């Protein structure tokens, strides 16, 4: 089974549509949270994911739509964007986010936004030592995660920055982050996603160019913080 792994779309419809257009043949699309926040098209992104039957878990920005008190943990521009998002979400979109689980499974593997540690949504996986502690508890399976906006693979041998376009063999125990569709932070502004072949035990990472200027124009028209527009072109 081949699974498309998308994460951190962040209301960026142009980036999502570019990814979906470039997507190779897969059996399932899995979204690893943070569907909304930062960007200008939360309802459009949700509608698109619903239309393709994508499976998704909840991220911290999605959680903030349901639990506004969590905004105290956000930086000022992220909180401002989240408040704007909450105001423009339709009742149908809000129900969709409320129905998302905090964690899920893809075959025998795990799918979360932050980490496989409860409550699954908030923890960042950033270094080898932290990843190794998680891998010991995870056992012989993979965990797909997002949250950091950085395409990465963590194994018992350490952190790997994956090459683009190559099929990479992955050991039985691994943490796999496809990077961010809507707000990459690795210095490359192109949308990032991955495809996992569960039978071949391999993962392929992809980057896709999209119309950043259109997204930036929408951000400015909506009155969202300027940093959300500027950072898209920088990939930061």
Question: Which residue ranges define each predicted feature?
Answer:
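Active-site environment of divalent metal-dependent phosphoester hydrolases
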Residues: 10-15, 37-40, 61-66, 119, ...
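Active-site neighborhood of phospho(di)ester-bond hydrolases with catalytic His/Asp-centered motifs
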Residues: 6-7, 29-34, 55-60, 112, ...
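Beta-strand-turn-beta hairpins that frame and shape the catalytic cleft
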Residues: 1-4, 105-111, 169-174
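Anionic-ligand binding region
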Residues: 128-167, 171-176
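Acidic, His/Gly-rich catalytic cores of divalent-metal-dependent hydrolytic chemistry
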Residues: 155-236
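N-terminal active-site segment of His-dependent metallophosphoesterases
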Residues: 1-54, 72, 218-220
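Active-site neighborhood of divalent metal-dependent phosphoester bond hydrolases
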Residues: 45, 51-112, 118-139
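Short, glycine/charged-enriched secondary-structure capping and boundary segments
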Residues: 18-22, 44-47, 70-73, 125-126, ...
């Amino acid at each position: 089974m081949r699974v498309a792994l998308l994460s951190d779309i962040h209301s960026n419809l142009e980036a999502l549509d570019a990814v979906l257009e470039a997507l190779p043949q897969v059996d399932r699309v899995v979204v690893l949270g943070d569907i909304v926040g930062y960007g200008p098209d939360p309802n459009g992104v949700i509608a698109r994911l619903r239309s393709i039957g994508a499976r998704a878990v909840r991220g911290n920005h999605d959680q903030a739509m349901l639990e506004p008190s969590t905004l105290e943990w956000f930086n000022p521009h992220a909180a401002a964007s989240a408040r704007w998002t909450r105001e423009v979400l339709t009742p149908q979109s809000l129900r969709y986010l409320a129905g998302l689980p905090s964690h899920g499974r893809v075959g025998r593997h795990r799918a979360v936004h932050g980490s496989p540690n409860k409550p699954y949504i908030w923890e960042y996986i950033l270094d080898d030592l932290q990843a190794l502690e998680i891998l010991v508890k995870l056992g012989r399976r993979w965990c797909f995660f997002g949250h950091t906006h950085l395409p990465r693979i963590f194994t018992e041998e350490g952190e790997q920055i994956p090459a683009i376009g190559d099929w990479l063999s992955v050991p039985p125990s691994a943490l796999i982050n496809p990077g961010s569709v809507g707000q990459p932070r690795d210095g490359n502004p192109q949308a990032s996603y991955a495809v996992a072949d569960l039978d071949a035990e391999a993962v392929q990472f992809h980057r896709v160019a999209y119309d950043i200027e259109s997204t930036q124009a929408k951000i400015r028209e909506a009155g969202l913080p300027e940093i959300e527009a500027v950072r898209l072109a920088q990939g930061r």
